[in-house]
């Protein structure tokens, strides 16, 4: 074996030893449940000690990712605004039942589909819903103008730059994840993007929310990319229009690694802002 081969073998062994240290799980060590980022309502649990405790039902936890799927024009971006508003202000008037646990973390929204004007209008909804412009932890980017590889690289760069500046990443929105690949049916690229998302959630201890279309005529997310998201996501959220309720969008938990959150509806208020339905609400517009 040449010296060069020995060096390569040594580097390989060191790399595998590092992976072994990072990935080994001690079954006798207590690992805490990942902290909740955004939740909908709560549940009561009886502990092994017989104590009754109330816990938030997660939509997403830190260190994991979720994705929203729906057919075109099902108000996916409005729902993203609803989650973002709840994350920025859990006591808002539009987000009944939704809670968040932001503490001092940052909220970052990457839009890949819309031009600057439409993107800004979406980003500003959170200001309008909370009647404030004092959101210095809220970072917004419209990435339509750059290529899919540059989008991946920029997201990675920006998350790292915030971390290097001493910031803690909280929730990251990527609306839409299909624009991080050349084709949602490209197996290699789809796998790479989902692996990237999983790595980012681990490295930055954040929750990532992605958005993807459903296939025409089915409830499956688009392409190989959608299949990879289904396999790896903590929570799969589905939006559907309810023909029996005026203007309502039904939000359901299609899959979850946690207790599934309860189905709920939202619709636009008289100002065109998304609002969770309350039983006492009366809609006449």
Question: Positions of the model-derived regions?
Answer:
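Conserved catalytic network of the ASCE P-loop NTPase/AAA+ motor domain
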Residues: 60, 99-103, 130-132, 162-166, ...
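The Walker A/P-loop phosphate-binding site
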Residues: 8-126
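Phosphate-binding/switch region of NTP-binding enzymes
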Residues: 67-69, 73, 77-78, 191-281
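Short, surface-exposed amphipathic charged segments that create phosphate/polyanion-binding patches used
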Residues: 5, 9-12, 148-160, 248-257
């Amino acid at each position: 074996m040449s010296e060069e081969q020995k060096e390569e073998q040594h580097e390989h062994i060191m790399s595998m030893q590092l992976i072994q240290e990072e990935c080994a799980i001690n079954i006798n060590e207590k690992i805490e449940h990942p902290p909740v980022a955004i939740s909908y309502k709560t549940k009561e649990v009886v502990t092994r000690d017989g104590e009754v405790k109330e816990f938030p039902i997660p939509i997403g936890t830190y260190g994991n990712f979720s994705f929203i799927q729906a057919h075109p024009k099902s108000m996916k971006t409005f729902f993203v605004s609803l989650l973002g508003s709840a994350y920025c202000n859990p006591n808002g008037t539009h987000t009944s039942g939704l809670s968040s646990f932001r503490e001092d973390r940052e909220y970052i929204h990457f839009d890949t589909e819309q031009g600057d004007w439409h993107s800004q209008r979406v980003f500003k909804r959170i200001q309008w819903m909370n009647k404030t412009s004092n959101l210095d932890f809220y970072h917004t980017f419209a990435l339509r103008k750059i290529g899919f590889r540059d989008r991946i690289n920029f997201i990675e760069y920006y998350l790292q730059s915030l971390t290097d500046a001493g910031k803690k990443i909280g929730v990251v929105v990527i609306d839409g994840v299909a624009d991080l690949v050349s084709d949602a049916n490209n197996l290699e690229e789809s796998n790479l993007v989902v692996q990237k998302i999983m790595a980012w959630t681990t490295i930055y201890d954040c929750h990532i929310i992605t958005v993807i279309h459903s296939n025409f005529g089915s409830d499956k997310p688009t392409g190989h990319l959608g299949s990879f998201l289904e396999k790896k996501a903590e929570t799969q959220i589905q939006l559907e229009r309810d023909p029996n309720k005026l203007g309502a969008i039904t939000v359901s938990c299609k899959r979850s690694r946690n207790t599934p959150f309860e189905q709920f509806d939202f619709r636009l208020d008289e100002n065109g802002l998304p609002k969770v339905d309350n039983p006492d609400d009366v809609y006449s517009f």
